[in-house]
Amino acid sequence: LHSELGLNNGDERSARLQARLTDHTFAVARALHRQADVTPVLAVSGLGPGNARRWGRQQGIDTVRLQGEGNLGTRIRRQLQPLRRHRIPALVVGSDLPDVHQRDLLMALENLQSHDLVLGPAADGGYWLIALSADLMQTPARWPLAGIPWGSDDVCRCTLEYAHRFNLSVALLRQQQDLDHLRDLNRWQGCRS
């Protein structure tokens, strides 16, 4: 989002927008932490370890991890691996969602009581949330992260096909508009007018 908007809109405006989106996501995560037994983890790219930890502390997030290299599936897998030993479900949510609310994440947690996988479809064909049940977290070979055409409009569809192949039960949340590109911002602003 930042680089795309920077090319078309000026770096300062895109940085302010990304900061607002990220602050909103932090606020939702903190609210969820207060209401449910959920520990937010901040996965960061573009910062060194010290700056990432400082930023997390400033936002009230104690656990901060670097995303590392690789495609989105590789980076998500890297964040999920350390959680396996806790035998808990995991939610991964993007920070480019102007309309995400605590109730969306609570709905994901509720759906994990009876489903292996929860997806929040994005209007562009991706997803804004992926959540894995505690049982699914114990079998990384079944995680729907490999062989997905990341960055395409087929991400959600291919993830659902993967889930079907592995007999994973899936719940879908409401579709949301994430802001990956300038056209997404224009579309979102048009819907808000």
Label each residue range with its predicted role:
Residues D37-L47:
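Short beta-strand/loop segment that forms part of the nucleotide-sugar
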Residues M137-Y162:
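Short, glycine-/small-residue-rich phosphate/pyrophosphate-handling segment
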Residues L1-R16:
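Glycine-rich N-terminal loop/short-helix segment of MobA-like nucleotidyltransferase
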Residues Q18-A36:
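A short, N-terminal amphipathic alpha-helix
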Residues V93-G94:
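Active-site acidic Asp-centered loop
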Residues V100-G125:
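Conserved donor-nucleotide/metal-binding helix-loop-beta segment in metal-dependent transferases, i.e.
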Residues V155-S193:
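Conserved alpha/beta core of the MobA/IspD/sugar-nucleotide pyrophosphorylase nucleotidyltransferase superfamily
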Residues R53-P89, P149:
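Short phosphate-binding loop-to-helix
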